[in-house]
């Protein structure tokens, strides 16, 4: 294998994809994921981490993939990201983590996003779920909106022990993940819903059909329902 080039990712053939709305990209299988992870140089001062908005320890999780320790890779990613299956598919890696990859200077960057997706999909298929914090601090926090930023915020707060409730105006949670990105790019039942369920497993409650300012006000949340922050 040419170490300067990415391992090709499997996709639907154009003639096939033109007949359905299923996900176009199949992602890596285990063999391809290990091969791609083996291209990582494990840089001491990893530029890819600086390019990641949530600062995932990319060399650490890629190393675990290389060694076949997918559950451990999931734990590394889970420390920083609540939505790895989503981010592995729709984040603009080419201008973020992969855009900073040293491999990309004289060749092709490591396919960090595809590896993140592989780990997330493997975790879902093998029943690996995020660990709920053993204790909460008793402090209630409300998050307005269940789009990617709201879900991420809620997940991070839950990991720190806060009692978090997300209030969503629409019928289904997910925001742009549910209502904006097409199925062939981001499957709803197979990817988005399981990711939302994983956030719930951290202890986050989600209330839909709640319009802040109409159904309930911020003052009511804080003065009457005991929320300490919104």
Predicted regions and their residues:
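Beta1-alpha1 glycine-rich phosphate/pyrophosphate-binding loop at the start
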Residues: 2-26, 55-67, 75-78, 105-113, ...
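Ferredoxin-type iron-sulfur electron-transfer modules and their immediate structural context
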Residues: 1-140, 227
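Short hydrophobic core segments
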Residues: 33, 144, 167, 227-230
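Short secondary-structure boundary/hinge segments and terminal tails
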Residues: 82, 119, 175, 216-217
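A generic local structural motif
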Residues: 127-131, 192, 216-219
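Conserved beta-strand-loop-beta-strand element in the redox core of flavoprotein oxidoreductases
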Residues: 211-230
């Amino acid at each position: 294998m040419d170490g300067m080039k990415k391992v090709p990712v499997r996709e639907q053939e154009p003639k096939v994809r033109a007949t359905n709305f299923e996900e176009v990209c199949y992602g890596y299988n285990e063999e391809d994921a290990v091969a791609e992870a083996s291209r990582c140089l494990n840089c001491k001062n990893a530029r890819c981490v600086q390019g990641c908005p949530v600062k995932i320890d990319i060399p650490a999780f890629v190393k675990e993939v290389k060694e076949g320790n997918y559950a451990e890779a999931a734990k590394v990613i889970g420390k920083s990201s609540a939505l790895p299956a989503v981010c592995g598919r729709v984040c603009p890696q080419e201008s973020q983590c992969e855009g900073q990859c040293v491999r990309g200077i004289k060749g092709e960057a490591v396919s960090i996003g595809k590896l993140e997706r592989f780990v997330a999909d493997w975790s879902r298929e093998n029943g690996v779920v995020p660990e709920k914090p053993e204790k909460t601090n008793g402090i209630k926090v409300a998050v307005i909106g269940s789009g990617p930023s709201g879900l991420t915020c809620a997940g991070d707060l839950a990991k720190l022990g806060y009692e978090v409730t997300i209030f969503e105006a629409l019928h289904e949670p997910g925001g742009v993940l549910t209502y904006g990105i097409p199925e062939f790019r981001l499957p709803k039942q197979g990817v988005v819903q399981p990711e939302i369920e994983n956030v719930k497993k951290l202890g986050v409650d989600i209330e839909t059909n709640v319009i802040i300012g109409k159904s309930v006000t911020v003052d009511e949340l804080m003065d009457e329902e005991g929320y300490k922050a919104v």
